From Swiss-Prot:
Gene behind this protein: bioB
Keyword Secreted attached: no
List of residues binding [4Fe-4S] cluster: C61, C65, C68
Protein name: Biotin synthase
Domain Radical SAM core: 46-274
Family to which this protein belongs: Belongs to the radical SAM superfamily. Biotin synthase family.
Main enzyme class: transferase
GO MF, one annotated term: biotin synthase activity
Binding positions for [2Fe-2S] cluster per the UniProt entry: C105, C137, C197, R269
Pathway, per record: Cofactor biosynthesis; biotin biosynthesis; biotin from 7,8-diaminononanoate: step 2/2
Top-level division of the source organism's lineage: Bacteria
Record-listed E.C. numbers: 2.8.1.6
Length: 335
């Protein structure tokens, strides 16, 4: 049982070990949530960032990620489409802002960023989103040092590149890109001065040891990732994991709480699979550390709760969101 008077979690650390993370992950749930909530209140207000995610280029990806319907190895019925034009993407960003989002995330189904017109358009999209007064995030696979610097010059807020799972379990999920490839991409992003957005997926068939190992890699990054998306598998027909079972909501709550304890200042983003969580489960995730969600009716290729439902949920709970709303002006006391 956690002793609230000890100093075990009083400092931000970058030297977590797998065994101690696994111990935290397996704490009695009430104790785990309580400790995570204390840390959440200490380092963050109860404010939830609303991030909108848009697929700029869908399908045709050369990677063989077994959970993804955008892979050329998938037999899913997803409709591929070429890259949207800059104006169309910025119009979508304007709509997202009107609906309450303050971060606009743009996704390309690529193994790596492609130079020439596609990359030039990406730069214009980043600049346009920033001109709207929004944070701009890109996820587009691997990138070069030069590309990272150009994105930084364009004002990119964050670059997303998830680790997906533990180093040990990774080969069961994807074989066309190594774990080290992912770490090198994150290093290039960080060296360019761009915030790192990096998380993973639970429900891929991994065990708690793998989840602890994933969190070990994330929490030992110095500094910690600016944002950490925690996804649960959405099993899509035609993918390698189409028969995957829906995880119990308690597993997501444990993952969110542990991530908050390990990375006190990061945005812990409740991401894909949230539609499968009950309202009560989402509330518990907010209570123990989630402070960002993807906002809007769909993600890249999966559905998501409607923005009307999300705004009602956040207001009913008393969670703050988006600085542009008067509702966010009230302060939250700390304990």
């Amino acid at each position: 049982m956690i002793n609230s008077d000890n100093q075990k979690f009083s400092e931000i650390r970058f030297d977590w070990e797998r065994d101690e993370i696994l111990e935290i992950l397996n704490y009695p749930l009430i104790d785990l949530m309580w400790e995570a909530q204390i840390i959440h209140r200490r380092f963050n207000q109860y404010k939830v960032q609303l991030a909108s995610l848009f697929s700029v280029k869908t399908g045709g990806c050369e990677e063989n990620c077994s959970y993804c319907s955008q892979s050329i190895y998938s037999s899913s019925q997803i409709k591929s489409h070429p890259q949207f034009e800059v104006e169309a993407v910025l119009n979508r960003a304007k709509t997202a802002k009107k609906e309450g989002a303050d971060r606009f995330c743009m996704g390309w189904a690529w193994r790596e960023i492609r130079d020439g017109k596609p990359f030039n358009s990406m730069i214009e999209m980043v600049k346009g989103v920033k001109e709207l007064g929004m944070e701009a995030c890109v996820t587009a696979g691997m990138l070069t040092d030069e590309q990272a610097l150009k994105l930084a010059d364009a004002g990119l807020t964050a670059y997303n590149h998830n680790l997906d799972t533990s180093p040990e379990y990774y080969k069961n999920i994807i074989t066309t890109r190594t774990y080290q490839d992912r770490l090198e991409t994150i290093k290039r992003v960080r060296n360019a001065g761009i915030n790192v957005c990096c998380g993973g997926i639970i429900g891929l068939g991994e065990d708690n040891g793998d989840r602890a190992s994933l969190l070990e890699v994330l929490s030992n990054m110095n500094p910690h990732p600016e944002s950490v998306p925690i996804n649960s598998l959405v099993a899509i027909e035609g993918t390698g994991l189409e028969g995957g079972k829906e995880i119990d909501s308690i597993e997501m709550i444990r993952m969110i709480a542990t991530a908050r304890i390990l990375m006190p200042k990061s945005k812990i983003r409740l991401s894909a699979g949230r539609e499968n969580l009950t309202k009560e489960a989402q509330i518990l995730c907010f209570q123990c550390g989630a402070n960002s969600i993807f906002y809007g009716d769909e993600l890249l290729t999966t559905s998501n709760p409607s923005f009307q439902d999300d705004r009602k949920l956040l207001k009913d709970v008393g969670v703050l969101f988006n600085k542009d709303f008067e509702y966010c002006d009230k302060t939250v006391s700390t304990v």
